[in-house]
Amino acid sequence: LKEIGNIGHAMNFIDEHLHAGEDITEYFVRELHAMTVNGLEREGDKTPGAYRSHGVSIAQSTHLPPEFIHVPAYMQELVEFMNRADAPKYDLMKVALAHHRFGWIHPFGNGNGRTVRLLTYSLLIKYGFNVKTSGRVLNPTAVFCNDRERYYSMLAEADTGAVEGLEQWCLYVLTGISAELKKVDKLSNLHFLNSKILYPALEYSKGRGVINETESTILKRIISQRTVKVNDLKEVLPGLKSAQITYQIGKLVDRGLLQPVEMGSRIYTAGFSKSDLMRGVIHALRKEGFIPNF
């Protein structure tokens, strides 16, 4: 759980501090690593945010990373490559090549895999791709996690340094990221999001006793309107008085299923991402083929 929390914290850092067109620095990369391994023992690193000072090997790979003395120069070269002003049509290819090169350098003692996926997410933002729409339920870098065996196989192809191997790696990454970005775009369609994900998530939650009929009715109205206040719910809850509706809203707010649009507001929106409804959302996403069924 700590490891997952660290990744979430690092992604918040990326979203807050990196915008399209901005340079990615070595400090930024080292900061991602420091946040990723913070407070971890077995999955941590003795020197968070610092390049390794010893040799390393890579699990499931025959590639032997360069001696530690060369890491700073290789990382400087990589950062210059990522920030170089090339035609936009090459952006996704640069994402693919930067991901492989980082793995090839293996700049840190531990946590390289987690850090490079965060770096890849950062590059997509830097190059202007819309990857935040889905609230991070989907992450375009999932292409590297869905089939780990194929991921390492394609990395090995690129590790040869041959043009054919690098082409195969780029094709693998571009195809995967394209598929994931299409999923994100699909979730940007309000009708699809409501009918295929959010409403089914409510039914799933109601069927498992997470919410009752009244709570489901309130949440459905919020999904259709995006926000509601007490008067908006009188039509769908004709048997309840205003005070009773206010009480129901208060219970949902206490559970994190509703949240005011701003502090002190009496206008509310649904809270899916950090509540008991999240399991229903995951179930709906899995049913629609958005996430793998492990």
What are the roles of these predicted feature ranges?
Residues 1-294:
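FIC/Doc superfamily catalytic core
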